[in-house]
């Protein structure tokens, strides 16, 4: 068995550190985040909200167009919301409703959200952070879920992510992101759809 806490640029949510800890370490006040992920959960927001609430902005690109289900994968009815798919037990539905509202307020103020139009088209996962002229990035397999970030209390996904330690590569990654983000043939704005999903009574938080 390998020792824990190996010094490595790999973040696997196992022996080599977590993506969540990378984000908590690198995100600063007024950071500009660019993220590509197939999933977004309010519980991942809750797990690192102390950092996320201080950012300047987040550009979030869904790599899978089924974005409404991606907000909370595998939730199909009200009873499924008692315990989320990431293993985070919540006390009651009122607490879930409060998290959803806080997340919606944050999205309204600081987040732009787009989705690729074509299913099974964009597979990469990426987190780029720009803070006061300093760039940080990590890319690999981790989605923006509690388990994907390695922050689950009852087990996490083993992922394969690599910190990008070259300035040239970090700049190339951001250029690549911008090219897709600004291409209307590939992506569409879905922010209002996401906010509609999070807003009562349309959602399942009640």
Regions found by a protein language model. Name each.
Residues 1-206:
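PLD/PLD-like phosphodiesterase catalytic module centered on the HKD motif
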């Amino acid at each position: 068995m390998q020792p824990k806490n190996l010094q490595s640029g790999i973040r696997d949510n196992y022996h080599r550190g977590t993506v969540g800890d990378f984000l908590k370490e690198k995100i600063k006040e007024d950071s500009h985040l660019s993220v590509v992920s197939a999933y977004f959960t309010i519980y991942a927001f809750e797990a690192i909200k102390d950092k996320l609430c201080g950012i300047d902005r987040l550009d979030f690109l869904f790599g899978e167009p089924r974005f409404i289900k991606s907000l909370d994968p595998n939730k199909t009815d009200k009873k499924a919301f008692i315990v989320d798919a990431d293993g985070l037990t919540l006390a009651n539905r009122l607490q879930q409703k409060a998290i959803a509202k806080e997340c919606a307020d944050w999205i309204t103020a600081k987040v732009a959200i787009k989705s690729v139009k074509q299913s099974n088209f964009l597979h990469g996962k990426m987190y780029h952070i720009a803070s006061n002229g300093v760039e940080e990035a990590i890319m690999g397999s981790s989605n923006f879920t509690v388990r994907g970030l390695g922050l689950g209390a009852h087990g996490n996904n083993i992922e394969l992510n690599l910190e990008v330690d070259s300035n040239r590569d970090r700049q190339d990654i951001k250029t690549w992101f911008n090219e897709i983000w600004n291409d209307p043939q590939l992506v569409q704005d879905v922010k209002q759809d996401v906010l509609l999903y999070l807003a009562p009574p349309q959602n399942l938080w009640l």
